[in-house]
């Protein structure tokens, strides 16, 4: 498929869907197309946002590629939460921030006492910019498997496990980064056996979410649960499956392969540990704040593991000899 030729474009990035909704309302009918970026990708799975026809698609990937990607965008950018890198001079005059994110020299959009925001300045500038002048090639991917959507297939998932059509679930996701070692997560996903299902969330998904994983038991093998905040959805899905099988989450055929980077990942990891979830694989590095004693406690109590190599880790998850 190709994207429409765009006269004007605004790209909105990071997590806050409320900002996206306000922007869509204020740009409706103005000839501006809105593209998501980064962790705004899951917004295309929400009916309340999909109803806006000028929510045109997703442009770009994880946060660490933003400087190159924003360079090539003939429009404005709205940054709604963190992971803002130093803006280059080539786009510094057309990037805006709001909420807790900002940078010296870029424009900031305040929230009004009633919670609303006035995006008129970024809208005005986007109308003045040329936008895309020719068709842009695009690829369609499947999103929108938060807990409500995923659990609407709970009966099928349970039956597929009981009939051995699905052998194992792998949750592969978390924060992405630019340092070496993160190709592990791409390699891991591509090595997962065909009779296993992959769940993913957060910007770590961009390591493999454009690959074709096919189907298993009549369902997509890759289910995109959402943003890093949506670890909550992953927990609800795991709890529902554990109830169906009469076990706890640790008794499920489920392995968590988490890519580690920054503070939101801290909250996600602590949430999982607070629920007693064990055997989490973490990498490519461990959190810097873990002292040797704390790390040993987590290893002894929760069997927290540092990733090794994809092939051996998959075998361990599946209970095979390494």
PLM feature spans:
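Anaerobic metallocofactor- and corrinoid-dependent redox/one-carbon enzyme cores
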Residues: 1-322
């Amino acid at each position: 498929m190709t994207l429409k030729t765009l006269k004007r474009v605004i790209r909105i990035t990071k997590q806050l869907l409320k900002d996206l909704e306000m922007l869509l309302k204020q740009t409706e009918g103005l000839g501006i197309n809105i593209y998501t970026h980064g962790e705004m990708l899951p917004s295309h799975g929400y009916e309340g946002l999909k109803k806006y026809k000028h929510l045109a698609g997703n442009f770009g990937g994880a946060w660490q590629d933003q400087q190159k990607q924003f360079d090539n965008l003939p429009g404005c950018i709205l940054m709604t939460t963190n992971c803002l890198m130093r803006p280059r001079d080539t786009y510094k005059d057309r990037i805006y921030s709001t909420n807790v994110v900002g940078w010296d020299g870029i424009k900031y959009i305040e929230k009004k006492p009633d919670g609303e925001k006035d995006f008129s300045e970024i809208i005005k500038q986007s109308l003045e910019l040329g936008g895309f002048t020719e068709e842009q090639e695009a690829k369609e991917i499947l999103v929108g498997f938060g807990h409500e959507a995923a659990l609407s297939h709970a009966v099928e998932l349970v039956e597929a496990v009981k009939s051995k059509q699905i052998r194992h679930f792998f949750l592969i996701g978390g924060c992405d980064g630019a340092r070496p070692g993160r190709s592990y997560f791409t390699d891991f996903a591509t090595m997962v056996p065909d009779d296993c299902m992959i769940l993913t969330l957060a910007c770590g998904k961009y390591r493999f979410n454009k690959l074709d994983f096919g189907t298993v038991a009549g369902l997509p093998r890759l289910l995109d649960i959402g943003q890093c905040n949506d670890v909550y959805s992953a927990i609800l899905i795991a709890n529902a499956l554990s109830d169906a099988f009469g076990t706890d989450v640790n008794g499920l055929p489920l392995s968590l392969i988490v890519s580690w980077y920054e503070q939101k990942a801290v909250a996600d990891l602590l949430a999982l540990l607070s629920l007693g979830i064990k055997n989490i694989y973490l990498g490519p590095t461990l959190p810097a704040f873990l002292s040797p004693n704390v790390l040993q406690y987590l290893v002894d109590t929760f069997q927290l593991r540092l990733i090794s190599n994809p092939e051996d880790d998959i075998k361990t998850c599946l209970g095979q000899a390494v």
